Structure formats: structure tokens, C-alpha cells
């Protein structure tokens, strides 16, 4: 029994590395992984991706990271969307659907749609760039079904 556990523990890093190498080639998989990581951290009482600089660097482009960092230096309180950009402050997320909209060599668009806890559905479009050998989120376009829309970069620039 002990040998089986040791063998499984030794093989786990290889299995995770194989999964990571598959996912890095799919922009939609990056968005799905970002939601999974964010929700896991939030359910455990953490701040999600925005509270972990390593996760931020794996998910966001360098340009977007610089904009977020510059915004965090401003002494006034950041808008709530910046603290939780993946859900646009949805009270609860359910039935998340992620689909690739378009993909070129170095840019892609991914659509994520989910049910909010308040009964509305929300659509987020992720502008992705291929950077440092992986797909990364470069901007997020938030559009609710009532017709309002805004972007993460727009919110950052407004502060």
C-alpha cells in the first residue's frame, strides 16, 4: 500500500505537466482554468487570482499586469471589478459555458457566459494574446443582457 502511494505521488507531477502542456495551446482552456483556479481560491476563503501574483502572471498579459499594478498604486479604493475581474462581481456563478470565438497565430477571442446568482446571465469576451509561449488574457469585455458593456482596460484607465 505504501509503495502504491509513493508511486502515485511520483507520477502526479508528470500527469499535471502533461495536462498543462495540452491546455496551453487552447485559449478556451486557459479561460476555463482561470475560472477553476479563481473559484477554488474564493471558496477556500482567498482572494482568487487577484490575490496571487503567480496566478496573475500565468493568466494575464504583461501589458494588462502593468495596468493592474499601476491601478493598485492609486491611494483611492479600486472598483470592485478590478478585485474580481473574471465574474464582474456576480454574487454567484453557475452554468459556465466557455467557447472559442476566433483564433489567429497570436490573438484569440473567447466567450464565457454564465448565470449570475441574481437570475441574470452575463457574457464576457476575453481578448487573448499568445505571449511567452502561452495564451494570456489581455482584456475582458463585459456585456450583460440589458445592453450595458464595459472593458477591464477601460475601468483601469478611468481610475
Question: At which residue positions do the language-model features occur?
Answer:
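Core segments of small alpha/beta cavity-forming domains
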Residues: 21-76
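Low-complexity, intrinsically disordered terminal/linker segments enriched in charged
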Residues: 73-74, 103-107, 118-122, 131-132, ...
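Sec/Tat signal peptide C-region and signal peptidase I cleavage site
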Residues: 15-20
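Extracytoplasmic/secreted envelope proteins and their assembly/folding machinery
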Residues: 28-35, 111, 125, 153
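Hydrophobic/aromatic beta-strand elements that line small-molecule binding cavities or substrate pockets
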Residues: 98, 124-130
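Sec-dependent N-terminal signal peptides
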Residues: 4-14
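Surface-exposed, charged secondary-structure patches
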Residues: 21-22, 59-120
Amino acid at each position: 500500500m505504501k509503495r502504491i502511494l509513493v508511486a502515485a505521488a511520483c507520477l502526479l507531477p508528470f500527469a499535471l505537466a502533461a495536462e498543462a502542456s495540452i491546455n496551453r495551446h487552447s485559449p478556451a482552456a486557459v479561460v476555463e482554468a482561470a475560472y477553476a483556479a479563481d473559484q477554488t481560491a474564493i471558496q477556500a476563503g482567498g482572494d482568487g487570482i487577484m490575490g496571487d501574483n503567480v496566478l496573475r502572471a500565468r493568466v494575464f498579459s504583461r501589458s494588462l499586469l502593468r495596468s493592474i499594478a499601476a491601478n493598485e498604486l492609486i491611494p483611492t479604493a479600486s472598483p470592485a471589478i478590478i478585485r474580481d475581474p473574471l465574474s464582474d462581481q456576480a454574487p454567484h456563478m453557475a452554468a459556465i459555458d466557455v467557447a472559442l470565438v476566433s483564433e489567429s497565430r497570436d490573438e484569440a477571442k473567447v466567450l464565457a457566459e454564465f448565470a449570475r446568482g441574481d437570475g441574470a446571465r452575463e457574457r464576457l469576451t476575453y481578448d487573448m494574446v499568445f505571449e511567452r509561449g502561452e495564451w494570456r488574457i489581455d482584456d475582458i469585455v463585459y456585456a450583460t443582457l440589458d445592453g450595458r458593456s464595459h472593458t477591464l482596460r477601460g475601468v483601469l484607465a478611468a481610475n
